[in-house]
A protein has these predicted regions:
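Feature captures the catalytic cores and cofactor-binding loops of soluble hydro-lyases/lyases
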Residues: 48-55, 59-217, 231-280, 284-297, ...
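Short, solvent-exposed loop/turn segments at the edges of secondary structure
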Residues: 203, 223-224
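Channel- or pocket-lining gating/hinge segments that regulate access to a cavity or pore
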Residues: 226-229
């Protein structure tokens, strides 16, 4: 038995099993998708629209997760491009790893794939694995020419299955047609007229690297003009509540200064009464406020000791 990043690996898997994914994402307590990935709720994905990249970055950094953001600036040598820069994309991550073609390795992958019930291991495999709310995230080692992981036909299937788009450390083709596809978006290394060639799909739903980020299946991604940030699913609820409570506290302090709130009123008492106007249940908000009041400030120190 081999060990990979602390995980028991019986053999190379093309598509990681639900059991492997559950072990990989053991910190998640909640519903899972049939393939084993954490299923952050659609309601939480909606609430993340009000969370800025900076707020998410600061929250994760305080948790000791310092490598969750990838810059999409077009002014550096590692720049990326976005089909619709004005449109954000938020969803649950499905990962794929592509590697340079090596025929004996590809033969091996096809044999392993057959044992997993996969008829053919190619760039269609991740696409057929998508479900609504997923974002297809793939590492193709920055390949642009011949690294076109999809065109308009596969792009249409991606959107039909996920209602989202893609984030590729690789490229796409048929940009004009993709740009006309309402609701579809892509964060990629570039565009190229070539068809995909010289690549093998080495894994689906395994850990991959996107720029400076290690991405796990089931992460939640926020993709915007400035870049992409990958949020471990176990932190999503706390992040949202942190941002929403900070906004509540700002409103509370402002209304206190204006004399709209009595000086004897405590924030927690007032905040719980406001929960009906937010996407927060009273129980959820109350539990978070109590947790914040009693939580020791040791998380960052504990994480830092791993470095």
């Amino acid at each position: 038995m081999l060990l990979l990043a602390g995980l028991p690996v019986r053999s190379q898997l093309v598509k990681w099993t639900p059991e492997d994914i559950k072990l990989l994402t053991k910190d998640w307590v909640g519903e899972r998708l049939p393939d084993g990935r954490p299923k952050v709720s659609d309601a939480h994905l909606e609430r993340l629209k009000k969370v800025t990249i900076e707020e998410a970055w600061e929250f994760l950094r305080a948790k000791g997760y310092e490598n969750q953001f990838e810059n999409f600036s077009g002014t550096n040598e590692n720049s990326w491009v976005i089909i619709h820069p004005e449109q954000e994309m938020i969803g649950r991550v499905l990962t794929a790893q592509y590697m340079p073609m090596r025929f004996d390795f590809d033969d091996y992958l096809q044999e392993v794939g057959k044992k997993q019930g996969i008829n053919r291991v190619n760039n269609n495999l991740p696409v057929t694995s998508l479900s609504e709310g997923d974002v297809y995230v793939a590492d193709a080692f920055g390949k642009i020419a011949d690294g076109t992981l999809l065109g308009d036909a596969v792009g249409a299937t991606v959107f039909r299955n996920s209602k989202r788009g893609v984030i590729f450390n690789g490229s796409v083709r048929k940009l004009d047609a993709l740009a006309e596809m309402e609701g579809f978006n892509a964060w990629v290394r570039g565009f190229d007229p070539s068809s995909i060639s010289g690549l093998v799909c080495a894994s689906v739903n395994a850990p991959i690297r996107i720029g400076r980020v290690t991405v796990l299946p089931g992460d939640v991604v926020i993709a915007r003009l400035s870049g992409v940030i990958f949020i471990p699913p176990q932190f999503v609820t706390e992040l949202i509540l942190s941002v929403e409570v900070t906004a509540l506290r700002s409103t509370f302090n402002q209304q206190r200064r204006e004399g709209k709130i009595d000086n004897n009123t405590q924030f927690n008492e007032w905040a719980i009464k406001q929960s009906d106007d937010l996407h927060i249940s009273k129980a959820e908000l109350e539990a978070y406020l109590n947790q914040q009041a009693s939580q020791p400030q040791s998380t960052q120190q504990t994480r830092s000791q791993r470095q």
